[in-house]
């Protein structure tokens, strides 16, 4: 077992160093989502760019030279899979999904033919059910498929049916015996009489780090995506068709380049004879296809073949061993009460490279055995610069099987609001998905150690806490104290520092006047936030309502004064469009001078400051209330009593030199309305709120992200208090409530919020 806990690289020292030098752009980031896409090497992209700069690549319908080059690429791809064009035709597509769709549309079933698919298949396989040319559609369980290896039935009928299964499951990396291909082609499937089956192998996950030998195993169809292997180019895949199965494909649609003749006035056409020419509609992505040559060259240079092992086989060895190291280290983690820290979702124990690929799937458990939500784990990982994948990974069957969810459970979770890709990770304490880490040829042992360190730091309690909290012994907050509005905070520039008001402040139809009215965008017009540039918090705007000026300050720089009234002069307006929280927003460019000041302050060239246009009408989802450039509501209310309660729950601030003050913690939550109530967390029960004479509706809780871990006074990131929120609320990353003004004036009259106003929360 001790040997299983260690990792020995399959590369030489020189090879490992050369590979590491190719990925210096990762800097401090730990990338563990190679099943999503692997990474391209620096030299690979330089070589691609040099080829584009030095050569003239014409449309292949124009230039025979380009067409010949594409044929070279086809030959190179087929050679990678140890086959040739006399055995397989290679049809370029936009990826595995497009290949599966093309097959589903084109496969000609016999009258009694069946479409059979493994339940543990990618969503793209499930989608084939909607368009295949048969109504006999059946899922097959993993155990049933594996039993086919021992089946003795024989089929002599013509091929009439189609089965699809993966060579490797993208959920947890388990590999399926490729002997199944020949067995099913020859003998059919138990329970389907004498039907003969064509076999489609979904090889997308498998070929990323494993050798598919098409001279030994010959599926009728193979689907794959090239970015899984090389990282670049994206949007390019292939459908490989065995020559014996070509006649079973009947394509209806035809595009440019696929016909011998087509008439405009009559419905008449004749398709080309070669399969590839019939199926590749229009102009291929020829520059992307040519770039595959650099992909092969890069892999073979960085991981050269050795005696008896191809490049891809050496990569398979490396990723398997690093996956086994990760699996065993996670399996060994224990809380102080000896309970497991991790629940693994696997069909093997990483004993055999032929049965397991480089993917590890798991959930994290609290000390009492309850689940940590995958969304929380994702947040914490991002704080530690770890990139991993969470959810169900577009494989609902494998997810359902490993999480032990019945169909009724899945529908119940859907009715409770959970949909694919959301952060609704726990429902009634049960996980809706999991955490996946996956490995490529450039993954290092240090990347796994980084993951382990994060889990140990955030989730393993080395001692069981005893004693009372400060909240239990501090009694200065009396039950008869009335809740008050302590402070108003507005953020004139989205994701920059707060402007704090302790007197009064006017409202507008969008919320607090001037709140999140401006946004900083990069040279591509993309809105910046502290998630990308934490130093934004050091830019602190101040608004002078009387002079209508905004003063920007930053440590070490002279203040910059922006005249707000000049931004409305028609001759100075420069309308721009940017995207904020998935919304396209019309905005006014504030000019070169302030752009230069911001670029210097943030040490990033090409930044611009934009102001939301007064004519812009922006709402969130179904709400009728207008909002500025805030994420989803007009106001965010934060209760100081709740922040104080949360601070007491943080076991220690080991990443900081000293415990943060209450004020600095409140600042992290970037609320607009800072209140103080007698009881902590009572705001969670409110449905409506009155502050002074103004009434507000509660729009719901605020879902938190890693921004609350940024010290707004310094820009320094830590893991708290997000870690504690996830633990205390069982993975629900929520703190604070969103409000909207119920009766804003529309006639131009101003309404004001006053600090020290009485706050009344209504729960009905």
UniProtKB/Swiss-Prot annotation:
For this protein, the parts annotated as crossing the membrane are none
Q: What SUPFAM superfamilies is this protein classified in?
A: MOSC N-terminal domain-like, PK beta-barrel domain-like, PLP-dependent transferases
The GO biological-process annotations, alphabetized, read as: Mo-molybdopterin cofactor biosynthetic process; molybdopterin cofactor metabolic process
Cofactor(s) essential for the protein:
pyridoxal 5'-phosphate
Transferase recorded as keyword? yes
Q: Name one GO molecular function term.
A: lyase activity
What is the E.C. number?
Answer: 2.8.1.9
Annotated active site residues, numbered on this chain, are 394
Pfam families in UniProt: Aminotran_5 (PF00266), MOSC (PF03473), MOSC_N (PF03476)
- Which residues belong to the signal peptide in this entry? none
Q: Per UniProt, which keywords does this protein have?
A: Molybdenum cofactor biosynthesis, Pyridoxal phosphate, Transferase
Q: Where is the MOSC domain?
A: 607-762
- N6-(pyridoxal phosphate)lysine: residues carrying this PTM: 228
Q: Which PANTHER family match?
A: MITOCHONDRIAL AMIDOXIME REDUCING COMPONENT 1, MOLYBDOPTERIN COFACTOR SULFURASE MOSC
Name the family.
Belongs to the class-V pyridoxal-phosphate-dependent aminotransferase family. MOCOS subfamily.
Q: Which HAMAP family match?
A: MOCOS
**The protein, known as:** Molybdenum cofactor sulfurase 1
Q: Per the UniProt entry, what species is this protein from, by scientific name? A: Aedes aegypti (Yellowfever mosquito)
